[in-house]
Design a protein with these regions (language model features):
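C-terminal glycine/acidic-rich active-site capping loop/insertion
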Residues: 41, 154-226, 251-255
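Beta-strand-loop-alpha-helix segment that lines the small-molecule cofactor/substrate pocket
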Residues: 1-43
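C-terminal capping/lid region of NAD(P)-dependent oxidoreductase domains
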Residues: 34, 244-256
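Aromatic/hydrophobic pocket-lining residues that form π-stacking "cages" and hydrophobic walls in ligand
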Residues: 23-25, 51, 241
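Rossmann-like NAD(P)H-binding beta-loop-alpha module
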Residues: 46-68
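Short glycine/serine/threonine-enriched helix-capping/active-site loop
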Residues: 37-40, 66-69, 107, 135
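Rossmann-like dinucleotide-binding domain that binds NAD(P)(H)
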Residues: 73-143, 149, 163, 230
Length: 256
């Protein structure tokens, strides 16, 4: 209604309850020349912005995987499953950090509350260049965990969002594969590298403040938002493919 009335919109995630609805909103905003921005709040935190900065700098090298654990006890909901509740956080972060488009997704889930809605799910998303993302989502955990590991060719990044001070740690650890000797001997030779660990400085500005500033700037400067409607639509497309995969017993589902 707001877009139809000619108003710019900052909308809570997910963008819509279906891909069709999301496509309509994005199309309407484009048609009317309005800002449609998604509340992907994590993308405006100092930690995630620092992760983006480190990735863009090339310090980590080639990215190999994104492994996220987002678990806690509850809150069980009557209208959505754990995927629609928790996955939008990680999917929006992935969309912000990873420039390549995801190819396909496979997922398995289980319901233990008798209402037919999954309260635990394991989601695997495949990208080009052999990059893979894995999400562990759970409403039935005795512990609250918010941890992500990004594995790469040069260094490794660990983000613990529950850590009050040192949320991000960079590990100078990895492997080296000796290709020439492997070809000669017909077997894999791997050496391991273990160096220093350092904690980068993170901007402590409140994420909601950064997001609102971005929204206002986009309106004034007539530019696309960092987490615009298109970003929200991409998250919806993965959510849809994830649900299809669960219904098909974990089959790979292409992401449209």
């Amino acid at each position: 209604i707001s877009l139809e009335s000619g108003k710019h919109v900052l909308i809570e995630k997910p963008l819509a309850s279906s891909v069709d609805e999301g496509e309509y909103l994005v199309s309407l905003a484009r048609e009317k020349g309005l800002q449609l921005m998604c509340d992907h709040t994590f993308c405006y935190t100092g930690a995630v912005r620092k992760m983006k900065e480190i990735i863009v700098s090339g310090e980590l090298g080639q990215l190999y995987y994104f492994d996220s654990v987002r678990i806690n006890l509850g809150l069980f909901q009557h209208d959505i499953n754990v995927i629609w509740d928790l996955a939008p956080h990680d999917l929006s972060i992935l969309d912000f950090l990873i420039e390549t488009k995801p190819i396909q997704v496979s997922a398995k889930g289980a319901c233990h509350a008798g209402n037919g809605l999954e309260n635990i799910a394991y989601v695997t998303i495949e990208y080009a260049d052999n990059f893979i993302a894995h999400l562990h989502l759970n409403w039935l955990s005795p512990l609250k965990v918010r941890k992500t590991i990004i594995g790469s060719s040069e260094k490794m990044l660990v983000w613990n969002d529950l850590e009050p001070a040192e949320k991000i740690k960079i590990y100078d650890k990895g492997i080296m594969v000796k290709d020439e000797e492997m070809e000669e001997r017909g077997r894999l030779l791997v050496s391991y590298r273990s160096g220093d660990i350092y904690v980068p400085h993170i901007d402590q500005t409140e994420a909601l403040s950064v997001m609102i500033t971005e929204f206002a700037s986009c309106i004034k400067e007539d530019r696309q938002a960092l987490t615009d409607g298109e970003a929200g639509l991409r998250v919806l497309q993965i959510l849809k493919a994830t649900e299809q995969s669960i219904k098909n017993d974990g089959a790979n589902v292409p992401i449209q």
